[in-house]
UniProtKB/Swiss-Prot annotation:
Beta-adrenergic receptors mediate the catecholamine-induced activation of adenylate cyclase through the action of G proteins. The beta-2-adrenergic receptor binds epinephrine with an approximately 30-fold greater affinity than it does norepinephrine. Residues 59-71, 130-150, 221-274, 330-418 are cytoplasmic. The gene is ADRB2. GO terms for molecular function: adenylate cyclase binding; amyloid-beta binding; beta2-adrenergic receptor activity; norepinephrine binding; potassium channel regulator activity; protein homodimerization activity; protein-containing complex binding. Glycans are attached at N6, N15, N23. Binds NHERF1 and GPRASP1. Interacts with ARRB1 and ARRB2. Interacts with SRC. Interacts with USP20 and USP33. Interacts with VHL; the interaction, which is increased on hydroxylation of ADRB2, ubiquitinates ADRB2 leading to its degradation. Interacts with EGLN3; the interaction hydroxylates ADRB2 facilitating VHL-E3 ligase-mediated ubiquitination. Interacts (via PDZ-binding motif) with SNX27 (via PDZ domain); the interaction is required when endocytosed to prevent degradation in lysosomes and promote recycling to the plasma membrane. Interacts with CNIH4. Interacts with ARRDC3. This is Beta-2 adrenergic receptor. Palmitoylated; may reduce accessibility of Ser-345 and Ser-346 by anchoring Cys-341 to the plasma membrane. Agonist stimulation promotes depalmitoylation and further allows Ser-345 and Ser-346 phosphorylation. Phosphorylated by PKA and BARK upon agonist stimulation, which mediates homologous desensitization of the receptor. PKA-mediated phosphorylation seems to facilitate phosphorylation by BARK. A motif (PDZ-binding) lies at residues 415-418. The modification Phosphotyrosine is found at Y141. It comes from Bos taurus. Disulfide bonds join C106-C191, C184-C190. A lipid is attached at C341 (S-palmitoyl cysteine). Keywords: Cell membrane, Disulfide bond, Endosome, G-protein coupled receptor, Glycoprotein, Golgi apparatus, Hydroxylation, Lipoprotein, Membrane, Palmitate, Phosphoprotein, Receptor, Transducer, Transmembrane, Transmembrane helix, Ubl conjugation. The modification Phosphoserine is found at S246, S262, S345, S346, S355, S356.
Length: 418
């Protein structure tokens, strides 16, 4: 976001008025510029490098190309644009203590900033709905939300985000009418984001608060359903272990099927926790800024300018966090290690250890040529299927992975979660 439209002085730089000697002041300014320049450069590098790594991993490894990870790619693209087109110019604005790119780029830069934040929160909202459908309608999930439908949803998210960010700013609907704001709009070297009260409140609600409320509500429902599933799995396993040993010996597949059912759902719930961390981190990083964004137009000079800028940069830093959070996933972690040449090709299992059948499902062959003998398979069998109906213990609370919809299509829940 641009700098706030209030009358505070720029306080992130050292204050020269108290310096006893001009040379000392210049040295202090130079040291501050160098230190902040290095810090901001590291932030930009972390954002760009991390999100390029995420996008490359999903593009290269077919096992990661799931519906949910399509949305993760959209989120990474928003963070990447933030790191390439927003944060560097914000850093220059701070370090040079003035805007040097002209009025047009000032408004365009601000529009891109709003676009990235809006696209991120709306994508997180879509991910919450995606997981809600996967948890509550496992029979129909892949028929309800195919990869082509996911692409359409992503396109709609970016179109809506573009309209809500570029249109009001490029049409100047955001502009305030007081003298200081008018003078800033006319100066090529001023890029403080002076806004009128209706725009500040409406844009914050549409771009952040409304999607946030939807995301929190839907995801709370997802966790409630997931918690009930885990409780039913525990009860189911208890009943299974209480069965006669001879019955298990007569049908050895029942034990394998029960273990695979539990393992699949436990892995899915771990993925839900990872997505919850992503959403929680985004909220913690951006919520303070959007609170201040409304407060400062209601009560001018209540929020100091340096506080506004620091909270804005806290939001920027969030773009570097997501790739670190994805490392919770064994699939992503191994993909990152292979892309960085930190391990030998263990993801050969994506192609060599798996074979596709006529229903476009992936079957684990039992051999993963990418793993060396004795190496721990920390990917948790990257090609492992969800529990099949043939192995399924039909008890309350357990859900088979396959179903046939009304048109006769096979709807499998074989979707790698992060």
């Amino acid at each position: 976001m641009g700098q706030p439209g209030n009358r505070s002085v720029f306080l992130l730089a050292p204050n020269a008025s108290h310096a006893p000697d001009q040379n000392v002041t210049l040295e202090r300014d130079e040291a501050w510029v160098v230190g902040m320049g290095i810090l901001m450069s590291l932030i930009v590098l972390a954002i760009v490098f991390g999100n390029v790594l995420v996008i490359t991993a999903i593009a290269k490894f077919e096992r990661l190309q799931t519906v949910t990870n399509y949305f993760i790619t959209s989120l990474a693209c928003a963070d990447l644009v933030m790191g390439l087109a927003v944060v560097p110019f914000g850093a220059c604005h701070i370090l040079m203590k003035m805007w040097t790119f002209g009025n047009f780029w000032c408004e365009f830069w601000t529009s891109i900033d709003v676009l990235c934040v809006t696209a991120s929160i709306e994508t997180l909202c879509v991910i919450a709905v995606d997981r809600y459908l996967a948890i509550t309608s496992p029979f129909k999930y892949q028929c309800l939300l195919t990869k082509n439908k996911a692409r359409v949803v992503i396109l709609m998210v970016w179109i809506v985000s573009g309209l809500t960010s570029f249109l009001p700013i490029q049409m100047h609907w955001y502009r305030a009418s007081h003298k200081e704001a008018i003078n800033c709009y006319a100066k090529e070297t001023c890029c403080d984001f002076f806004t009128n009260q209706p725009y500040a409140i409406a844009s914050s609600i549409v771009s952040f608060y409304l999607p946030l409320v939807v995301m929190v509500f839907v995801y709370s429902r997802v966790f409630q359903v997931a918690k009930r599933q885990l409780q039913k799995i525990d009860k189911s396993e208890g009943r299974f272990h209480a069965q006669n040993v001879s019955q298990v010996e007569q049908d050895g597949r029942s034990g394998l099927g029960q273990r695979r059912t539990s393992k699949f759902y436990l892995k899915e719930h771990k993925a839900l926790k990872t997505l919850g961390i992503i959403m929680g981190t985004f909220t913690l990083c951006w919520l303070p800024f959007f609170i201040v964004n409304i407060v400062h137009v209601i009560k001018d000079n209540l929020i100091r300018k340096e506080i506004y800028i620091l909270l804005n940069w806290l939001g920027y830093i969030n773009s570097a966090f997501n790739p670190l959070i994805y490392c919770r996933s064994p699939d992503f972690r191994i993909a990152f290690q292979e892309l960085l040449c930190l391990r030998r090709s263990s993801l050969k299992a994506y192609g060599n250890g798996c074979s596709s059948n006529s229903n476009d499902r992936t079957d684990y062959t039992g051999e993963q040529s990418g793993y060396h003998l004795g190496e721990e398979k920390d990917s948790e069998l990257l090609c492992e299927d969800p529990p099949g109906t043939e192995n399924f213990v039909n008890q309350q609370g357990t859900v088979p992975s396959d179903s046939i919809d009304s048109q006769g299509r096979n709807c499998s829940t074989n979707d790698s979660l992060l």
